[in-house]
Amino acid sequence: HGSTKWCPSPDAAQKYACCHHGMATYVLGSENEMPWKFDRAYKSDITHVMDEMKLHYTDKYHVEYKISDMTGAEVTDIKLESSVVFEPGLGKYGEGRAWIEPVTSAVRIRKNLNDLSGDELILRNYIKQMTKDGSYQQIAAFHGLPAQCPSEDGTTVHTCCLHGMPTFPHWHRLYVALVEDELLSRGSRSGRPYWDWIDPFDRLPDFFNDATYYNSRTLHIESNPFFRGSMSFANTLTDRDAQDVIYNNH
């Protein structure tokens, strides 16, 4: 965050310790999930910050952090120890010393849902197959309801998602892989698409907001499985109530 280097003020009249913002991490959760736990620092790539400050990882600098809740109030009762880990790059220098990034993607490429081709939109058909045989609901239950994970003392049953725990990234990686393996077994050639909701938008994507879609295989207009789903344990359908605050919000 800071270093022994000094940066001039805009008018060059004073000098300040150089300070660059490195990263921000959000921890989610709800009253239905397992207890919120934050007992270690999250790992994040700060290579770009080191480059901007022209720092080598062995140089003298220090890292500062601030923990706040979603209202902006600072959380002061959690003390974490930060550290910097150097991991050599996996790429290589090519012709003209141009850096070549390594190929790390698998056969199943996860694309932005706004960039899906017409052929890839057939993903709806595979999801519909999963909803019909119950496999989609089984996987969804591992993330949400019905709650299946008991507390340590056995008095409470929580939903199994780990949003408020440091192990969440690992859990979610396995969860996405579980969905993609199910799609692959049904003939899907693409990975599970993602919605980049960080980009400002004025309406929900048609991919999951349209109630129906044209199925090019059956040549019929059919219900969109991403629009509404069945919850057999509650004998009801899912509903969506998008709040205006999400639109055009940076």
Curated annotation (Swiss-Prot):
InterPro entries: Di-copper_centre_dom_sf, Haemocyanin_beta-sandwich, Haemocyanin_C_sf, Tyrosinase/Hemocyanin, Tyrosinase_Cu-bd. PROSITE patterns: TYROSINASE_1. It comes from the Eukaryota. It holds the Pfam family Haemocyan_bet_s. Residues 1-106 are annotated as: Unit C. Its cofactor is Cu(2+). Disulfide bonds join C7-C18, C149-C160. Cu cation binds at H1, H21, H143, H172. Binds 2 copper ions per heterodimer. Keywords: Copper, Disulfide bond, Metal-binding, Oxygen transport, Repeat, Thioether bond, Transport. Residues 107-250 are annotated as: Unit D. SUPFAM superfamilies: C-terminal domain of mollusc hemocyanin, Di-copper centre-containing domain. GO terms for molecular function: metal ion binding; oxidoreductase activity; oxygen carrier activity. There is a cross-link at C19-H21, C161-H163 (2'-(S-cysteinyl)-histidine (Cys-His)). Belongs to the tyrosinase family. Hemocyanin subfamily. Hemocyanins are copper-containing oxygen carriers occurring freely dissolved in the hemolymph of many mollusks and arthropods. Decamers of large identical subunits (390 kDa), each containing 8 globular oxygen-binding functional units. This is Hemocyanin, units C and D. It comes from Sepia officinalis.
